[in-house]
């Protein structure tokens, strides 16, 4: 998304806690986009200024529900328009896959996921986001293939 947004004239700040991923992004950044895009190693919870849009692709999928809400609340304070984010929707098949994954030695496991019931998440926090931040939360789309499932949501001010 970063390159496409910069190509369309947006000023982009890409943040990741992985310095390796940031270095890859910097190397792949076309020279004509260097004025519009910057990539830094940091934590999304640090204050990096005010943004019109914040996009969190798979950034929240490792956090339990309470932490996810706290992160979104913190980011809403510095958001002018909306936050787009993905969550991993809980379902029987995913629960089964995660249980099977726990059978492997710890070093062979994938990162921890925190699936959430996204429909309940929206229903539970809709009033809170509207009341405290004048923001609406809704689902935009679902992405699913055999190994990857997520739901794309937005918090719009």
PLM region spans:
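Class I (Rossmann-like) S-adenosyl-L-methionine-dependent methyltransferase catalytic domain
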Residues: 1-49, 70, 74, 84-157
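Conserved acidic residues
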Residues: 52, 81
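Short catalytic micro-motifs in class I SAM-dependent methyltransferases
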Residues: 58-59
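Helix-capping/helix-break motifs at membrane-protein junctions
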Residues: 64-65
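Short, conserved loop/helix-junction motifs that constitute active-site signature segments
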Residues: 76-78
């Amino acid at each position: 998304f970063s390159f496409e947004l910069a190509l369309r004239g947006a000023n982009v700040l890409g943040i990741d806690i992985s310095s390796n991923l940031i270095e890859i992004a910097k190397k792949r950044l076309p020279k004509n986009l260097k004025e519009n895009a910057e990539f830094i190693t940091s934590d999304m919870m640090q204050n990096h200024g005010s943004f019109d849009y914040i996009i969190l692709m798979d950034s929240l999928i490792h956090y339990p529900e309470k932490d996810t809400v706290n992160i979104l609340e913190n980011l809403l304070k510095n958001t002018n328009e909306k936050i787009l984010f993905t969550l991993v929707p809980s379902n029987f098949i995913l629960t089964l896959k995660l249980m099977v994954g726990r059978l492997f030695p710890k070093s062979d496991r994938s990162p921890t996921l925190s699936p959430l019931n996204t429909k309940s998440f929206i229903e539970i926090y809709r009033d809170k986001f509207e009341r405290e931040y004048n923001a609406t939360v809704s689902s935009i789309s679902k992405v699913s293939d055999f190994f990857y499932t997520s739901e794309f949501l937005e918090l719009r001010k």
